[in-house]
Amino acid sequence: FVVTENHGEWLKVLLPVRPNGTQRWVHTSQVRTSTIQAHVAINLAERRLVATVDGTVIADTPVVIGAADTPTPTGRLFLTHYDEKSEGSAYGPWVAALSGFSQALDRFSGGVPVIAIHGTNNPAAVGQARSNGCIRIPNDVIRVLRDSLPLGTPVDIWP
């Protein structure tokens, strides 16, 4: 979860559910909190991702964004889990799943259309708008993110 407000013993947190941006109040006794000094910013207009840890840029790369009919959703999301894939897969070696979902698709690949940051088997597409809503990045960069960003890292996606 990402805490968005703190009122005494109550925390308002982002939830990994539809619709994107859903928040709920939880009592501090129900959760364990920690401070994460990592952040990812994705600028869709510039088609660029910048990731920082402790204020230091660890990745600054062009990206593939969602196509016109399957756009990448905007807003604050957070990193929920990593999935390892085979090196030559369409997703590259790692998928960094986020707390958001496609707003254009009801289902994807037999399941819910979770938005993710992942590698690619088509590096020539980097810089284009041609995904189903996910952010595709070079495989060497997704490895850096996997090794550096903890679960819960906030991800801000801007138009």
Enumerate the language-model features and the residues they cover.
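Short, surface-exposed loop motifs enriched in S/T, G, D/E and P with embedded aromatic residues
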Residues: 1, 62-63
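Short, surface-exposed charged micro-motifs
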Residues: 2-3, 39-41
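A short, compositionally biased micro-patch
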Residues: 6, 43-45
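Short, surface-exposed beta-strand-loop junctions and turns on beta-sheet-rich folds
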Residues: 17-21, 55-59, 152
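Exported/periplasmic cell-wall-interacting domains
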Residues: 30-38, 60, 67-78, 83-159
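Gly/Thr-rich phosphate-binding beta-strand-loop-beta motif of the actin/hexokinase/Hsp70
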Residues: 48-49
